[in-house]
């Protein structure tokens, strides 16, 4: 009997303790988020909170650094890398020179952590172990898809400007980009289908332009037909002479890598001098132009400049006062 009463009393005690635990103020409260600030969501769906605008921002690729250099003053950028300082490859080399910090190209987590950034922009193609290590160390990493078309570039500009707390500046960059795209369209929209020219681009690695890549959309926005997409060129593949003849481009584009490839001259000489390509229309007519490498895959606010460069070279007559392509 005593045991029964004892067990019953213990049960009452445990029940009371449980009720007390549930009452407000009787258990530890989770830490409350600081009032104010703002939240942003990256392309992984992860929410990042900022109590104030980040002051030491780092982007881990040339293209991310180029965006930051037009969004922020140099003192809010933690560091830039050698490619961003090189005018052969960078469209923001002059602004990059005003940033105090330096970091190697494609750094691991240690050099990035040494910068003590309060926001890191990274592309989803970046090494996942680097991103994971930085996040484990407590750094805020905003991950984004690599843009492969104009809409994705627009999205990137909006995301980055919102993350750094400068949405108005982002809107200004978008307006500049859209103005250039609209200008090209106004000059090329009336070119009939039969006068649309087929362009084939060549880098030091050979012909390029697979249909899912950014260059394809740059061509499309320029009113130009991307020759490589005509035969559904796969990413990372190379075109044979037979495939180039099958495309039979109206005009060829040679990437200017600076002094390393004689400013595109080495590619030109190799392609135009290939005996197997002498019947190709562009080779016979010597129709070609050079494009700086920094424009070829410009997935930043400078995409509008790349579109304009290609359109002007392919349809020079459309950009005269009469504005009629021949």
Task: Enumerate the language-model features and the residues they cover.
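Alpha-helical, coiled-coil/dimerization segments enriched in small aliphatic residues
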Residues: 86, 208-236
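Bacterial N-terminal signal peptides that target proteins for export
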Residues: 2-13
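Short helices/loops that flank or line small-molecule/ion binding pockets
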Residues: 107-116, 137, 238-248
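Short helix-initiation/N-cap motifs at beta->coil->alpha
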Residues: 43-45, 99-110, 147, 232-241
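Extracytoplasmic substrate-binding proteins
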Residues: 26, 47, 129-207, 228-229, ...
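Bacterial lipoprotein signal-peptidase II cleavage site
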Residues: 26-35
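A short, structured surface patch at a secondary-structure boundary
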Residues: 58-115, 119-124, 227
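Bacterial N-terminal signal peptides
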Residues: 13-22
């Amino acid at each position: 009997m005593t045991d029964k009463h004892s067990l019953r009393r213990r049960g009452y005690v445990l029940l009371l303790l449980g009720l007390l635990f549930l009452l407000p103020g009787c258990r530890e409260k989770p830490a409350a988020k600081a009032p104010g600030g703002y939240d942003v969501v990256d392309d992984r769906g992860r929410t990042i909170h900022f109590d104030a605008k980040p002051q030491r921002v780092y982007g881990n690729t040339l293209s991310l650094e180029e965006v930051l250099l037009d969004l922020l003053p140099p003192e809010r950028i933690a560091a830039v890398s050698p490619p961003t300082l090189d005018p052969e490859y960078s469209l923001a080399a002059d602004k990059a020179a005003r940033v105090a910090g330096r970091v190697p190209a494609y750094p691991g987590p240690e050099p990035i952590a040494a910068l003590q950034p309060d926001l890191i922009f990274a592309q989803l193609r970046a090494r996942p172990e680097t991103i994971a290590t930085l996040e484990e160390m407590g750094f805020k990493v905003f991950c984004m898809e690599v843009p492969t078309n104009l809409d994705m570039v627009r999205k990137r500009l909006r995301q980055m400007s919102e993350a750094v707390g400068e949405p108005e500046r982002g809107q200004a960059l978008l307006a500049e980009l859209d103005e250039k795209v609209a200008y090209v369209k106004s000059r090329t929209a009336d070119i009939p289908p039969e006068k649309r020219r087929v362009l084939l681009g060549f880098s030091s690695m050979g012909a390029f332009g697979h249909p899912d890549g950014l260059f394809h959309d740059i061509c499309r926005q320029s009113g130009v037909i991307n020759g490589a997409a005509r035969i559904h060129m796969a990413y990372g593949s190379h075109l044979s002479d037979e495939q180039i003849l099958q495309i039979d481009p109206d005009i060829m584009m040679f990437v200017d890598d600076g002094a390393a490839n004689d400013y595109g001259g080495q590619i030109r000489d190799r392609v135009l001098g290939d005996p197997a390509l002498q019947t190709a229309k562009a080779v016979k007519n010597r129709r070609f132009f050079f494009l700086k490498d920094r424009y070829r895959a410009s997935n930043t606010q400078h995409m509008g400049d790349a579109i304009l460069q290609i359109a002007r070279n392919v349809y020079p007559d459309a950009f005269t006062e009469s504005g009629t392509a021949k």
